[in-house]
Protein backbone atom coordinates (compact mmCIF):
# COMPACT_ATOMS: atom_id res chain seq x y z
CA UNK A 1 0.00 0.00 0.00
CA UNK A 2 1.30 3.45 -0.90
CA UNK A 3 1.74 6.04 1.83
CA UNK A 4 -0.35 9.20 1.50
CA UNK A 5 2.04 12.10 1.00
CA UNK A 6 -0.33 15.02 0.52
CA UNK A 7 -3.99 15.90 1.01
CA UNK A 8 -5.60 18.70 -1.01
CA UNK A 9 -8.53 20.38 0.72
CA UNK A 10 -11.19 22.61 -0.80
CA UNK A 11 -12.03 25.48 1.51
CA UNK A 12 -14.98 27.62 0.47
CA UNK A 13 -18.11 25.52 0.41
CA UNK A 14 -16.47 22.38 1.77
CA UNK A 15 -14.18 22.85 4.78
CA UNK A 16 -15.93 26.12 5.71
CA UNK A 17 -19.36 27.38 4.67
CA UNK A 18 -20.44 23.89 3.68
CA UNK A 19 -23.13 24.46 1.08
CA UNK A 20 -21.65 27.72 -0.23
CA UNK A 21 -24.22 29.96 1.40
CA UNK A 22 -22.08 33.12 1.38
CA UNK A 23 -21.36 33.20 -2.37
CA UNK A 24 -24.84 32.01 -3.37
CA UNK A 25 -26.47 34.84 -1.42
CA UNK A 26 -23.99 37.33 -2.91
CA UNK A 27 -24.66 36.09 -6.46
CA UNK A 28 -28.43 36.41 -5.97
CA UNK A 29 -28.13 39.94 -4.55
CA UNK A 30 -25.71 41.16 -7.22
CA UNK A 31 -27.89 39.94 -10.09
CA UNK A 32 -31.08 41.21 -8.41
CA UNK A 33 -29.58 44.70 -8.15
CA UNK A 34 -29.36 44.69 -11.95
CA UNK A 35 -32.97 43.54 -12.26
CA UNK A 36 -32.00 39.95 -13.05
CA UNK A 37 -33.49 36.95 -11.28
CA UNK A 38 -31.27 33.94 -10.77
CA UNK A 39 -32.60 30.94 -8.85
CA UNK A 40 -30.64 29.34 -6.05
CA UNK A 41 -30.24 26.22 -8.19
CA UNK A 42 -28.91 28.28 -11.09
CA UNK A 43 -26.54 30.17 -8.79
CA UNK A 44 -25.12 26.89 -7.50
CA UNK A 45 -24.59 25.42 -10.98
CA UNK A 46 -21.08 26.73 -11.75
CA UNK A 47 -19.70 26.30 -8.21
CA UNK A 48 -16.00 25.56 -8.18
CA UNK A 49 -15.04 28.12 -10.81
CA UNK A 50 -13.41 31.43 -10.08
CA UNK A 51 -16.16 33.82 -9.14
CA UNK A 52 -15.85 36.01 -12.25
CA UNK A 53 -16.07 32.90 -14.46
CA UNK A 54 -19.04 31.80 -12.38
CA UNK A 55 -20.81 35.09 -13.11
CA UNK A 56 -19.98 34.77 -16.80
CA UNK A 57 -21.57 31.30 -16.81
CA UNK A 58 -24.70 32.65 -15.12
CA UNK A 59 -24.97 35.31 -17.81
CA UNK A 60 -24.91 32.52 -20.42
CA UNK A 61 -28.05 30.93 -18.98
CA UNK A 62 -30.94 31.44 -21.43
CA UNK A 63 -33.18 32.86 -18.69
CA UNK A 64 -30.57 35.43 -17.64
CA UNK A 65 -29.66 36.33 -21.23
CA UNK A 66 -33.34 36.91 -22.02
CA UNK A 67 -33.95 38.98 -18.88
CA UNK A 68 -30.93 41.10 -19.68
CA UNK A 69 -32.14 41.72 -23.24
CA UNK A 70 -35.60 42.68 -21.98
CA UNK A 71 -34.22 45.01 -19.30
CA UNK A 72 -31.42 46.66 -21.27
CA UNK A 73 -32.39 46.20 -24.96
CA UNK A 74 -28.99 44.71 -25.77
CA UNK A 75 -26.84 41.65 -25.21
CA UNK A 76 -24.69 41.47 -22.10
CA UNK A 77 -20.99 42.24 -22.43
CA UNK A 78 -17.83 41.61 -20.46
CA UNK A 79 -18.35 45.03 -18.86
CA UNK A 80 -21.64 43.73 -17.44
CA UNK A 81 -19.85 40.67 -16.06
CA UNK A 82 -17.28 42.91 -14.35
CA UNK A 83 -20.01 45.22 -13.04
CA UNK A 84 -21.89 42.36 -11.41
CA UNK A 85 -18.63 40.88 -10.14
CA UNK A 86 -17.88 44.14 -8.30
CA UNK A 87 -21.33 44.05 -6.67
CA UNK A 88 -20.89 40.35 -5.89
CA UNK A 89 -17.56 41.03 -4.15
CA UNK A 90 -19.11 43.85 -2.12
CA UNK A 91 -21.88 41.54 -0.86
CA UNK A 92 -19.54 38.62 -0.30
CA UNK A 93 -16.98 40.62 1.68
CA UNK A 94 -19.80 42.08 3.80
CA UNK A 95 -20.96 38.61 4.85
CA UNK A 96 -17.86 36.41 4.62
CA UNK A 97 -16.92 36.51 8.30
CA UNK A 98 -20.29 34.94 9.14
CA UNK A 99 -19.33 31.82 7.16
CA UNK A 100 -15.82 31.00 8.35
CA UNK A 101 -16.52 28.28 10.91
CA UNK A 102 -14.93 25.01 9.80
CA UNK A 103 -17.20 22.00 9.49
CA UNK A 104 -16.96 19.57 12.41
CA UNK A 105 -13.77 17.52 12.30
CA UNK A 106 -11.76 19.65 9.85
CA UNK A 107 -9.40 21.10 12.47
CA UNK A 108 -8.81 17.68 14.01
CA UNK A 109 -8.08 16.13 10.60
CA UNK A 110 -5.61 18.90 9.74
CA UNK A 111 -3.87 18.47 13.10
CA UNK A 112 -3.60 14.69 12.57
CA UNK A 113 -2.26 15.12 9.04
CA UNK A 114 0.41 17.50 10.37
CA UNK A 115 1.36 15.07 13.17
CA UNK A 116 1.64 12.26 10.61
CA UNK A 117 3.91 14.36 8.39
CA UNK A 118 1.40 14.55 5.55
CA UNK A 119 1.57 17.70 3.48
CA UNK A 120 -1.59 19.77 3.16
CA UNK A 121 -2.55 21.75 0.09
CA UNK A 122 -5.65 23.74 -0.59
CA UNK A 123 -7.84 24.88 -3.43
CA UNK A 124 -10.74 27.29 -3.61
CA UNK A 125 -12.78 29.46 -5.92
CA UNK A 126 -12.17 32.39 -3.56
CA UNK A 127 -9.59 35.08 -4.23
CA UNK A 128 -6.62 35.62 -1.90
CA UNK A 129 -8.37 38.63 -0.35
CA UNK A 130 -11.44 36.50 0.40
CA UNK A 131 -9.32 33.72 1.89
CA UNK A 132 -7.54 36.24 4.12
CA UNK A 133 -10.93 36.77 5.78
CA UNK A 134 -11.95 33.11 5.83
CA UNK A 135 -8.64 31.86 7.21
CA UNK A 136 -6.83 34.72 8.94
CA UNK A 137 -4.69 32.28 10.92
CA UNK A 138 -4.33 29.68 8.16
CA UNK A 139 -0.55 29.32 8.52
CA UNK A 140 -0.87 27.77 11.96
What are these language model-derived features?
Residues 2-107, 111, 115-119, 129-132:
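N-terminal helical cap/lid subdomain that shapes the substrate entry/recognition surface
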Residues 124-126:
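Conserved phosphate-coupling serine/threonine residues in phosphotransfer and NTP-handling enzymes
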Residues 140:
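Conserved small/polar residues in nucleotide/adenosyl-binding loops
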Amino acid sequence: MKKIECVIMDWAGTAVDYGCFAPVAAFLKAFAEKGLTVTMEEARGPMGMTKIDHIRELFKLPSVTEQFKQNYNRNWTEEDVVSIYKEFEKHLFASLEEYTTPIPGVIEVIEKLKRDGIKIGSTTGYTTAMMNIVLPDRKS
